[in-house]
């Protein structure tokens, strides 16, 4: 066989000319050490702060410490298979989670992956977990109510849409119960709720999901769970992931409510990560930026104006404001609200609801201390009728507490003081409410109206709650138009008051309420 050298050289030249080599540029590094979920990597000179890194076995990590000759990263999940000498790749992306309506009704982990066994979530949209909060110009003042359905909160410590209201108290004082009531009460209002469980037992989270399902609240709720058994990194990220999911609705001119249960455990997880990364510890061994950890999260809860919504939706949604309301929960130790994390979060939020162990054990539930609980912006958002009728409640309770303290030393009390004490006792009793028995505006207004006009003056304290319940049922059946009118207008007309006065007279004559 004759070989033609010219032919061969032509073939080789043609191959060389047509050769296309697409060079993929990727920064790679080598694992130096792995300890407690923290990986030190050599050679990732181009890594960004907060960038996602890819480890062998499709495991993701987060670049947190950018040092001169190494990068300190935290692994998001299992790290037992990562070993010294493994190759790590930069992804060039900041950590993102899936967002969208498809998440509603589902239970997901801190990275937005479904963990409820109901199959994959079909959403194509993702958003970064870390975002800059809306600026002053993009915001609108809080002037719409976020009804919790709890008499004590809606009358004395009102929450508005776009507000951050802290729920603070010791363990086992009913903090989660208050937050769950607020979520259940949003049924039928169009408000989407996000419940972020941080560092809780998996059994507790399963119980919360079951209760929400029982009360039909999962239809408007997303549950983001980072259990106590998961990596500290996931417990640290979970609140930001939940916030991103809530911002999706806020930026489209809708209203959302997010509960962080609880931020004390997030701070502990962040402290663990920071100490393992050898960052210098400060007060209570927390790192220096623990205030920023919570402030950058809670500042993202806001009410944004129409222009901002229009800009974010590219003109699709016009004339609508969006809001994200936050109810962060903080657990105190033996009622110490002057500890580092509680004082930080109190200073960031727009008010706080203090829950006390003594009140809880005395059977006053929700165990709210009305004296030191405040809402700094909610007053402007309160419904007219509740604002008008609820004004005397806080005063009555304050006077009652003061007189109750003095009456312990006084043997004989004058008639006026005795009446005031009795009134205070009745008000305290009527502020009690069972879990998942939320009231709408009209039902709450009815109770407050009855307190204000002295209808309970001849009702024994022990029978006050039963009297309230029976009277509500009576009005629901005999005068439903009054409740409908109050719910529709948010105010109580003179005509409605006259109808209620007649109804109260008729009810008292037929109901055996006296001891």
Swiss-Prot record:
What is the membrane topology listed in the Swiss-Prot or TrEMBL record? Peripheral membrane protein
The record's catalysed reaction(s) read:
ATP + H2O + 4 H(+)(in) = ADP + phosphate + 5 H(+)(out)
Return the GO cellular component terms, semicolon-separated: plasma membrane; proton-transporting ATP synthase complex
Which positions in this protein are listed as binding ATP? 169-176
List site positions: Required for activity: 373
Entry EC number(s):
7.1.2.2
> Which keywords appear in this protein's UniProt record, sorted alphabetically?
ATP synthesis, ATP-binding, Cell inner membrane, Cell membrane, CF(1), Hydrogen ion transport, Ion transport, Membrane, Nucleotide-binding, Translocase, Transport
Cellular localisation: Cell inner membrane
Which Pfam families does the UniProt entry name for this protein?
A: ATP-synt_ab, ATP-synt_ab_C, ATP-synt_ab_N
State any single GO MF term: ADP binding
Grouped into one coarse class, the protein's main location is: membrane
Catalytic class of the enzyme: translocase
Q: What does this protein do?
A: Produces ATP from ADP in the presence of a proton gradient across the membrane. The alpha chain is a regulatory subunit.
Give the matching PANTHER family.
Answer: ATP SYNTHASE SUBUNIT ALPHA, MITOCHONDRIAL
Family the UniProt entry places it in: Belongs to the ATPase alpha/beta chains family.
The entry describes its oligomerization and partners as: F-type ATPases have 2 components, CF(1) - the catalytic core - and CF(0) - the membrane proton channel. CF(1) has five subunits: alpha(3), beta(3), gamma(1), delta(1), epsilon(1). CF(0) has three main subunits: a(1), b(2) and c(9-12). The alpha and beta chains form an alternating ring which encloses part of the gamma chain. CF(1) is attached to CF(0) by a central stalk formed by the gamma and epsilon chains, while a peripheral stalk is formed by the delta and b chains.
**Protein name as annotated:** ATP synthase subunit alpha
Origin organism is Neisseria gonorrhoeae (strain ATCC 700825 / FA 1090)
């Amino acid at each position: 066989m004759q070989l033609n050298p010219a032919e061969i050289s032509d073939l080789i030249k043609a191959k060389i000319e047509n050769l296309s080599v697409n060079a993929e540029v990727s920064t790679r590094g080598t694992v130096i050490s792995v300890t407690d979920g923290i990986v030190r990597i050599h050679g990732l000179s181009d890594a960004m702060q907060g960038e996602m890194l890819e480890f062998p076995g499709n495991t993701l990590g987060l670049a947190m410490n950018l040092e001169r000759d190494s990068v300190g990263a935290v692994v998001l999940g299992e790290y037992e298979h990562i070993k010294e000498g493994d190759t790590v790749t930069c992804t060039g992306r900041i950590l993102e989670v899936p967002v969208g309506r498809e998440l509603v009704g589902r239970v997901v982990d801190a990275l937005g992956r479904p963990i409820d066994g109901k199959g994959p979530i079909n959403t194509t949209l993702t958003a970064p977990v870390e975002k800059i909060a809306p600026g002053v110009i993009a915001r609108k003042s809080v002037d719409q109510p976020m009804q919790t359905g709890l008499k004590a909160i809606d009358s004395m410590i009102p929450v508005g849409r776009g507000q951050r209201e802290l729920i603070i108290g010791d363990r086992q004082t009913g903090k989660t119960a208050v937050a769950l009531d607020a979520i259940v009460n949003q049924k039928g209002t169009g408000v989407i709720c996000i419940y972020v469980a941080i560092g809780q037992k998996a059994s507790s989270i399963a119980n919360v999901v079951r209760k929400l399902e029982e009360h039909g609240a999962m239809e408007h709720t997303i549950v983001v769970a980072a259990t106590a058994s998961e990596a500290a990194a996931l417990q640290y990220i979970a609140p930001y992931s939940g916030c991103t999911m809530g911002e999706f609705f806020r930026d489209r001119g809708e209203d959302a409510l997010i509960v962080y249960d609880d931020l004390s455990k997030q701070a502990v997880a962040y402290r663990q990560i920071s100490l393992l990364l050898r960052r210098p510890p400060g007060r209570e061994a927390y790192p220096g930026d623990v205030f920023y950890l919570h402030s950058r999260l809670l500042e993202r809860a806001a009410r944004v104006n129409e222009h901002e919504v229009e800009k974010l939706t590219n003109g699709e949604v016009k004339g609508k404001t969006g809001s994200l309301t936050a109810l962060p929960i903080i657990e105190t130790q033996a009622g110490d609200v002057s500890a580092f994390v509680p004082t930080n979060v109190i200073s960031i939020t727009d008010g706080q609801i203090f829950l006390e162990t003594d009140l809880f054990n005395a059977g006053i539930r929700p165990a709210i201390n009305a004296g030191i609980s405040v809402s700094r912006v909610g007053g402007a958002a309160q419904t007219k009728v509740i604002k008008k009728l609820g004004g005397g409640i806080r005063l009555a309770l304050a006077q009652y507490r003061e007189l109750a303290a003095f009456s312990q030393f006084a043997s004989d009390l004058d008639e006026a003081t005795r009446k005031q004490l009795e009134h205070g006792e009745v008000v305290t009793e009527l502020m009690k409410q069972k879990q998942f028995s939320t009231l709408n505006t009209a039902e709450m207004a009815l109770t407050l109206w009855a307190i204000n006009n002295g209808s309970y003056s001849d009702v024994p304290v022990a029978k006050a709650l039963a009297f309230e319940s029976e009277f509500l049922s009576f009005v629901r059946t005999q005068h439903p138009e009054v409740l409908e009118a109050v719910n529709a207008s948010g105010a109580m007309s003179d005509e409605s008051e006259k109808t209620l006065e007649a109804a109260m007279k008729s009810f008292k004559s037929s109901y055996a309420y006296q001891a």
